[in-house]
């Protein structure tokens, strides 16, 4: 049995993570202005919680980081909609405006005593270990570990959302992109990183490795769901095959009462929308659906093998 994925936004988890009314109020405002960003924040919070579990973080840190993941983009409520929701690439000027969501979110949190403990999440989640991030160009250990976790979760969900994945097939391609961000930029290898024998990319490689585990969990969860659906399809196929056998017996009988007996049995087994005329097509569609789903499962297991071989 596979455990269900953590649903951060459920009332049970909101209670267990002690999100007080002021935080929910701020998030409701964010959702009203930009549902897309709110959903992204929910996904990041979910990932942060699960990453912390794999990183064996203390519960208090996990709670803090999970809430921080939810609040990391709260500054976007101040970004003009025409920039925030622009479908194409931002201009340099628009990008500079977009970057201010970090400082705006920080100011919002610092202005409210209940949000203040989470103020560094909006501020630091775009900082990079190699110093190329914003807004302050922090490096290495100057970036809070919690913000490093949020950055990995944020980048992963941003790529997955942009590509509109409906399955984890080919999800390893997303992880390969993140691996590039965990590796040092070749342009900097001749500089101070090489001199100190320290090589940093933009994101934390250890956190990324644990993201691999989270993704594998999600793949197994998807496989479990597909297998449940296949079992349902098999039950339907079994029922329709029984109908098919009754139909053959009716066709082979010369007795009208016997024919009607089997036809009545067929009608009793029909579900809504099924008839004597269309059930063979329905049966064929179910059989094809099983083959298709089994193929997806094979692809998903292949993804797991690929992910397990990934190196940072």
Language model region names:
Residues 2-311:
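Histidine- and acidic-residue-rich, metal-dependent catalytic cores
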């Amino acid at each position: 049995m596979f455990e269900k994925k953590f649903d951060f936004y459920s009332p049970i988890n909101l209670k267990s993570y002690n999100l007080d009314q002021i935080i929910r109020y701020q998030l409701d405002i964010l959702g009203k202005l930009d549902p897309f960003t709110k959903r992204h924040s929910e996904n990041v919070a979910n990932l942060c919680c699960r990453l912390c579990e794999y990183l064996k973080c203390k519960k208090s840190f996990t709670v803090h980081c999970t809430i921080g993941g939810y609040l990391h983009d709260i500054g976007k409520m101040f970004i003009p909609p025409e920039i925030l929701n622009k479908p194409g690439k931002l201009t340099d000027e628009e990008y500079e405006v977009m970057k201010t969501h970090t400082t705006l979110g920080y100011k919002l949190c610092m202005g409210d005593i209940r949000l203040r403990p989470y103020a560094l999440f909006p501020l630091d989640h775009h900082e990079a270990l190699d110093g190329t991030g914003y807004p302050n160009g922090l490096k290495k250990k100057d970036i809070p570990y919690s913000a490093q976790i949020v950055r990995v979760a944020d980048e992963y969900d941003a790529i997955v959302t942009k590509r509109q994945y409906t399955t984890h097939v080919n999800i390893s391609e997303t992880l390969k992109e993140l691996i590039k961000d965990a590796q040092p930029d070749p342009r900097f290898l001749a500089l101070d990183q090489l001199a100190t024998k320290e090589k940093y990319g933009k994101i934390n490689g250890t956190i990324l490795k644990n993201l691999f585990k989270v993704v594998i969990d999600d793949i197994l969860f998807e496989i479990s769901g597909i297998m449940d659906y296949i079992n349902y399809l098999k039950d339907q196929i079994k029922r329709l095959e029984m109908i098919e056998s009754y139909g053959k017996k009716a066709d082979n009988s010369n007795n009208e009462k016997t024919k009607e007996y089997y036809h009545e049995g067929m009608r009793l087994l029909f579900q809504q929308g099924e008839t004597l005329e269309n059930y063979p097509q329905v049966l064929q569609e179910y059989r094809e659906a099983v083959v298709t789903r089994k193929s997806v499962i094979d692809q998903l297991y292949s993804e797991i093998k690929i992910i397990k071989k990934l190196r940072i």
